[in-house]
Amino acid sequence: METSVSRVTVSLTLLVLIICSADAMNYLAFPRMGRARPGYLAFPRMGRSQMKTETGTDCCGLGMKSEFVIGQEGKEELRHGACSSSVACCAGLREIVDQKQDGVFFSMCVPDFVASRSSEESSSEVLSKLKSLLQK
């Protein structure tokens, strides 16, 4: 009887180990799939600069460039968006500076349209949409 109990114990232990290793394989074998699955702990990507754009060029792409905030104590803070404020916008984009309703100044790179009547209308539409997104 003692032999069969140890066989059952060994069998159950192996079964638990196989199940645990099958679940752990998803966590350990594919660390970059972490954002696709909820509750998954992914390893950080090493060796990538957060200041560069996706294309790897030295210019800012479409979107937020920087924010200038004056805190309650009068402390000034410059927050960088996708790139630093010293880098120019990429070709085909121009930089605009505006102010939110709460007093925060921001700069962003928006498409630079040719100065024709139809493009002026579409340029103002794009600018108003981007401003409405910033106010949310």
UniProtKB/Swiss-Prot annotation:
What keywords is this UniProt entry annotated with? Answer: Amidation, Disulfide bond, Neuropeptide, Secreted, Signal
This one is known as Small cardioactive peptides
General function of this protein:
Involved in the stimulation of contractile activity in the gut, the increase of the amplitude of the heart beat, and enhancement of the contractile response of the radula closer muscle.
- Any signal peptide, and if so, which residues? 1-24
> Does the keyword section mention Amino-acid biosynthesis?
no
Give the organism the record lists: Aplysia californica (California sea hare)
- Modified positions (Methionine amide) are M33, M46
Modification after translation is described as:
Contains three disulfide bonds.
Q: What is the annotated tissue distribution of the protein whose record heads this document?
A: Highly expressed in the buccal ganglion.
This protein's GO cellular component annotations are: extracellular region
Homology family: Belongs to the SCP family.
